[in-house]
From Swiss-Prot:
GO molecular function terms noted in the UniProt entry: L-arabinose isomerase activity; manganese ion binding
PANTHER family in UniProt: L-ARABINOSE ISOMERASE (PTHR38464:SF1)
Cofactor binding, per record: Binds 1 Mn(2+) ion per subunit.
UniProt pathway annotation: Carbohydrate degradation; L-arabinose degradation via L-ribulose; D-xylulose 5-phosphate from L-arabinose (bacterial route): step 1/3
Annotated residues for binding of Mn(2+): E305, E330, H347, H446
Keywords, comma-separated and alphabetical: Arabinose catabolism, Carbohydrate metabolism, Isomerase, Manganese, Metal-binding
EC number: 5.3.1.4
Reaction(s) catalysed by this chain's protein: beta-L-arabinopyranose = L-ribulose
Biological role stated in the UniProt entry: Catalyzes the conversion of L-arabinose to L-ribulose.
Name of the molecule in the record: L-arabinose isomerase
GO cellular component, as recorded: cytosol
Induction remarks: Transcription is repressed by glucose and by the binding of AraR to the operon promoter. L-arabinose acts as an inducer by inhibiting the binding of AraR to the DNA, thus allowing expression of the gene.
């Protein structure tokens, strides 16, 4: 798997000197206790307790330190007592990383029999957080507000998901996309403003001729290929019939050579996402298939036909999902059976095996597109369950994230003449409304499909990144969506 930085999140508690040292010590103890209680909510990122801030100077210095820290991916703020919000203005003015406002309190219940004014004075986040919330709103700051008892499982889940999103935002600012060949000729939606994306997201897109990859592949040894083929044999199903067929074994080994060449090329250039094009294969024996699936399984972002936006999006979502159950996808064909409308998603070859229901099979079949030799690919049916589809498009002067909540379906019918990876789903609120809404929003035919992430996480990411977002869900109606798109258009024109 591709590795990401070991990020941390700083837990910052606000108060003021008015309460005296004894109360401030209690506030700090409570903050430490909460941090300890939250320590296990993320398998990857830790929450670091910071001293209670009580003045404009301490707030400014702490937020400045967080802003310049290489490992701090964001801060979690909480007002245990009342913290006059004017103290936060200077610090928040220069802070640009993800910000969470945790609206909670140390105690879950009111101590009915013993409560007194001392308790009230030292446990007043119910109105201290409102003061802090006001100044955030007054300053127009983007932030995540989570309300509830800090030890509640739902609150912990929300916090963990936000941390994954914030870390992915930080990490994705360093995404580099290697683009082998250009855009598929005459295709509109896969093109876009690369300079704008570099400014907005930090995504760097570099173009290469396919010969640059072939040159690296030519240096791969037979021993390296044989070793990787043996790994394929351990991890996936290769039929005995295929193993006896020298031409098919050679085809699988050619994909191993492509995988090794791609890996070497990407590692050397520091790339974590890439695109290919079936129109640009000079010097290649096959269209990359199995090789691409393997790299996605390791965490690389990918999209076909030069679609650099989707490739970067897949990489970003894989960071957020910790590499789990997330893949490049394409809406391919519809099932219009009344009351059971579904979409079959696939691509020519390139669907990530992290969404496979069972152990994938390596098969070799002809592929008319590209005009090359028969390519090896992983063949499998996709899993069922709740998922999201995400598409990022250049809508002219800005980027738009289009989301659709979907429900993955178990594939119950055999498709013996379709030897590719395939996934079946029902979109919310229905195929008819979802398709109409998607088309009205300008969503692409290439997407990232994830069973691991939620629409809320992606909406949070869009807000952090400063781009427009459109969600198609069970509550969507075409009438409301059209108005939303018009309002968004007006808003972004005003912001120019």
């Amino acid at each position: 798997m591709l590795q990401t930085k070991d990020y941390e999140f700083w837990f910052v508690t606000g108060s003021q000197h008015l309460y005296g040292e004894e109360t401030l010590e209690l506030v700090d103890q409570h903050a430490k206790s909460i941090c300890e209680g939250l320590s296990g909510i993320s398998s990857r990122y830790k929450i670091t307790h910071k001293p209670v801030v009580t003045s404009p100077e301490t707030i400014r210095e702490l937020l400045r330190e967080a802003e310049y820290s290489e490992t701090c991916a964001g801060i979690i703020t909480w007002m245990h007592t009342f913290s006059p919000a004017k103290m936060w203005i200077e610090g928040l003015s220069s802070y640009q990383k993800p910000l969470m406002h945790l609206h909670t309190q140390y105690n879950r219940d009111i101590p009915w029999g013993t409560i007194d004014m001392d308790f009230m004075n030292s446990n007043q986040s119910a109105h201290g957080d409102r003061e802090y919330g006001y100044i955030n709103s007054r300053m127009g700051l983007s932030r995540k507000v989570i309300a509830g008892y800090w030890d509640d499982e739902e609150v912990k889940k929300e916090m963990s998901q936000w941390m994954d999103t914030a870390a992915a935002l930080n990490e994705s600012r360093h995404i580099k996309v290697a683009r082998f060949g250009d855009n598929m000729r005459h295709v509109a939606v896969t093109d876009g403003d690369k300079v704008g994306a570099h400014i907005q997201f930090g995504w760097q897109v570099d173009g290469y001729g396919i010969g640059d990859l072939v040159e690296v592949m030519d240096r791969i040894t037979d021993d390296e290929v044989d070793t990787l083929y043996a790994e394929y044999d351990r991890l996936y199903v290769i039929s005995e019939e295929t193993k006896r067929d020298e031409a098919k074994v050679a085809s699988i080994k050619e994909q191993a050579k492509i995988e090794l060449g791609l890996t070497a090329f990407l590692e050397q250039g520091g790339y974590t996402a890439f695109t290919t094009s079936f129109e640009v294969l000079h010097g290649m024996k096959q269209l990359p298939g199995l090789a691409v699936q393997r790299l996605m399984e390791k965490g690389y972002g990918f999209a076909g036909e030069g679609d650099w936006k989707t490739a970067a999006l897949v990489r970003m979502m894989k960071i957020m999902a910790k590499g789990k159950r997330t893949s490049f996808m394409e809406d391919y064909t519809y099932h219009f059976e009344p009351g059971n409308e579904m979409i079959l998603g696939s691509h020519m070859l390139e669907v990530c095996p992290t969404v496979a229901l069972d152990q994938p099979k390596i098969e070799v079949h002809s592929l008319s597109i590209g005009g090359k030799e028969d390519p090896a690919r992983l063949v499998f049916n996709g899993i069922s369950g709740s998922a999201i589809q995400a598409s990022i498009v250049d809508i002219g002067g800005r980027f738009r994230l289009v989301l659709n909540e979907v429900n993955g379906q178990e594939i119950e019918k055999d498709m013996p003449n379709l030897p590719v990876a395939r996934v079946l789903w029902k979109p919310e609120p229905s195929l008819k409304t979802a398709a109409e809404a998607w088309i009205l929003a300008g969503g692409a035919h290439h997407t990232c499909l994830s069973y691991e992430l939620t629409a809320e996480q992606m909406l949070d990411w869009a807000e952090m990144a400063g781009i427009e977002s459109v969600l198609i869900s069970r509550d969507t109606t075409i009438h409301k969506l059209k108005h939303e798109l018009k309002w968004n258009e007006a808003l972004y024109r005003l912001q120019k």
